[in-house]
Amino acid sequence: GLLIRAFEEIQWMREEQISLSASFDASVYAWNHGAVHTLKEEQAAFITAPWELNSRELEPVFEACRREGLPAELIVYGRAPMMVSAQCITKTVKGCSKCPSLLWMKDRTGARLPVQNHCAFCYNTILNPLPVSLHGCADSVKRLAPEGLRLCFTIETGEETKAVLNAFAAEFIRGENAEPPFTEFTRGHFRRGVE
């Protein structure tokens, strides 16, 4: 199947006569029951809840998914994409290296932002400097009753990935109180939502 990150990709699949299943990522906003219904009509295999909704706003989305018989997952760990740039930072600053790598840039507050370059298509994804983590929120997550939980690894080392997986498995699978292997993180919009 394909992971759809922009609704226009569905039309591309039709034009190219691609008959794979389509799953919709968090960037294809399933903000309400109408959006969930539309995604179901588009033959979605599953959806990923948007990063931007808080726990109260997610409740009707997951309820709509259950009514539609559409599996839905919730991202419980990962660095949220803050921006996708249409130009490559490396190419602009020092010329194209044709080598995918992790870059860093500073924002106006001095925070270091990780930047992934995607050489095949000459664009960058600027990530949140802190990972979103719902570790410690198992009760709130279970109330939402998503069909799946997603952990998104981007810049973590193998060792860091293993430690994060172990901490989330302890809390969400075994029901244990486990300390997360990181000290700096954000809850994202889970507690506050979009203004």
Regions found by a protein language model. Give the residues of each.
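Active-site pocket-lining/capping segments in soluble small-molecule metabolic enzymes
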Residues: 1-195
